[in-house]
Amino acid sequence: MALLEIKNVVKRFGDYTAVNDVSLSVEAGEFFTLPGPSGCGKTTLLRMLAGFEQPDAGQILLDGQDMSQVAPEKRPVHTVFQSYALFPHMTVRENIAFPLKMAKWDKRKIAAQVDELLEDVRLTQFGDRYPHEMSGGQRQRVAIARALVDRPRLLLLDEPLSALDAKLREEMQIELINLQKEVGITFVYVTHDQGEALALSHRIAVMSHGKVEQLDAPEKLYSYPKNRFVADFLGQCNVLEGTVKALHGDAMTVALKGCGDVKCQAVAGVKEGQQGWLALRPEKVKLDKELPELPDEAYFKGRVHDCLYLGDVTLYVVEVADGVLVEAMQPNNIPGVAKFFDDGDVVEIAWRFDAGSFLTE
């Protein structure tokens, strides 16, 4: 049985439906992420899991028990927010111990539990410091330790890293992954950061307009998006309009608008003449001054329209026809492979027939 089950949950604010008939389940010990753009309903859903909002319809089951109308303090659930909400007049140790003191735990048990959490979040030497004496990342770890100290069944995290700088955010992602493995508690994590969702999660439910667009493992979502929204939301993606021209076995020919025919993998239920879009990740596109024309590859000549140097890679935008742009990602640091091109250079691009996904919605 799943630890958490969300069944047909709806939440309205006046005439606005923030969460629209969402159903999903989360397994015990899972790191589950809800990414989506602002206003997609992810935070409202998290607030219902915490008990800060009540659903207008549907059920929220935790260990098989309906929690939809249970008060927040009665749920075995804790929440970590973007703001750390630490008590400034208390030390790190006192902040972490606070929930246990309120629950009237024995002092020796409190001390042992706090010591264990300090070790889990790698802050053993900071127990006697005050919040203002610590970095943002350290304060966030204290907030997480406080939320975990009485071992809740479920930890909710509402964009906890968004206030940190990019480098510290990356470090904290690794800390969170290791911490979740160590404590074994189920995490449900809300973020607008696609990279964060891909890096942290066992599974991801991408949300848009109050609905779950697609739920799967990160690598499946990235490689096999269900629709244009998911393809475009999770990382860089070429989305090229086209029409199915012919079907042949496990492949099909698609006429890309403005630039010619390509082969791609067949999609169940697709018919000749059907319109759609080829979703193609830039790192799957080969780019060079000259490329061999191979039978299982799409091939185009073009001109470099723009280039964006990103350190380890460069993103090239290649115009292959009037107004038709294809992005190609090239590594910069591989000996014998790294090549650089300038705006206006004439180049050739190619990709394997199975490199992209044909989308019908």
Curated annotation (Swiss-Prot):
Its main location: membrane. Keywords: ATP-binding, Cell inner membrane, Cell membrane, Membrane, Nucleotide-binding, Translocase, Transport. It comes from the Bacteria. The complex is composed of two ATP-binding proteins (PotA), two transmembrane proteins (PotB and PotC) and a solute-binding protein (PotD). It is found in: Cell inner membrane. Its EC number is 7.6.2.11. The keyword Transport applies. It holds the Pfam family TOBE_2. It is a peripheral membrane protein. Transmembrane segments: none annotated. The gene is potA. Residues 4-234 form the ABC transporter domain. ATP binds at G36, P37, S38, G39, C40, G41, K42, T43. It is an enzyme of class 7 (translocase). Gene3D superfamilies: 2.40.50.100, P-loop containing nucleotide triphosphate hydrolases (3.40.50.300). The lineage of its organism: Bacteria, Pseudomonadati, Pseudomonadota, Betaproteobacteria, Neisseriales. It catalyses: ATP + H2O + polyamine-[polyamine-binding protein]Side 1 = ADP + phosphate + polyamineSide 2 + [polyamine-binding protein]Side 1. This is Spermidine/putrescine import ATP-binding protein PotA. GO terms for cellular component: ATP-binding cassette (ABC) transporter complex. Belongs to the ABC transporter superfamily. Spermidine/putrescine importer (TC 3.A.1.11.1) family. GO terms for molecular function: ABC-type polyamine transporter activity; ATP binding; ATP hydrolysis activity. It comes from Chromobacterium violaceum (strain ATCC 12472 / DSM 30191 / JCM 1249 / CCUG 213 / NBRC 12614 / NCIMB 9131 / NCTC 9757 / MK). InterPro entries: AAA+_ATPase (IPR003593), ABC_SmlMolc_Importer (IPR050093), ABC_transporter-like_ATP-bd (IPR003439), ABC_transporter-like_CS (IPR017871), Mo/tungstate-bd_C_term_dom (IPR008995), P-loop_NTPase (IPR027417), PotA-like (IPR005893), Transp-assoc_OB_typ2 (IPR013611). Signal peptide: none annotated. Part of the ABC transporter complex PotABCD involved in spermidine/putrescine import. Responsible for energy coupling to the transport system.
